[in-house]
């Protein structure tokens, strides 16, 4: 059973990871820095809530403070079915705390998303297991996994 979970997570990671073409791989001297950085959620494993830190625009060395990045963060189960859209914790720039991270425009900076462990906007708690969270910033997708343990 453990092997099946490992194989499934490896397959999902390979499917969701951004692909690098051979032309991009050859041009290492002129490669741009990533638009975003997705950190591991904490605590992990968790019950019933977690936080997901991420940074946008090369934070802390933001070169263009006026640029607004289109950000979406989603949580999926292992079948890649949408489970929830976390909310931004606190507030930063022009983004209010508690706002769902779905096509939100944010400036360069460091942020923390909050997920209460429920399915969507319901009070039904997510089942124990592995979940995948995907951050999309201006078309760049970053993926990581987390564990809900009851």
Task: Please report, for each region that a protein language model flagged, where it lies by residue.
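Sec/Tat signal peptide C-region and signal peptidase I cleavage site
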Residues: 19-23
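Bacterial N-terminal signal peptides
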Residues: 9-17
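Bacterial N-terminal signal peptides that target proteins for export
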Residues: 1-9
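Short loop/turn motifs at secondary-structure boundaries
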Residues: 25-150
